[in-house]
Amino acid sequence: MKKLLFLFVMVYAIKLHIKGKVQGVNYRYSAMQQAISLQLCGWVKNNADGTVSAHVEGPKEIVELFIAWCKQGPPEAQVLHVEIENTEPKNFTDFTILR
């Protein structure tokens, strides 16, 4: 009798709302590069009020690394606050910049 091995990875999903000097400083592009390097899925976008939002999915420990990066951002950014909200996974297959 053959034994089957199943590997289950819990997908953790969050929404982020980043406040501060986060537009016009390559925040979205840098966030996308960071997410891709961590093999996370989701999106990032600018908002009309000058903030940046993101939806990120992946293993909890890796998502937490991304959150830590978001609190710093790229060198030109000045992040004042990051709001974090748990949400349901949407099963994205890549990470993109929404316009």
Task: Report each predicted region and the residues it spans.
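Intrinsically disordered, low-complexity, mixed-charge
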Residues: 2-99
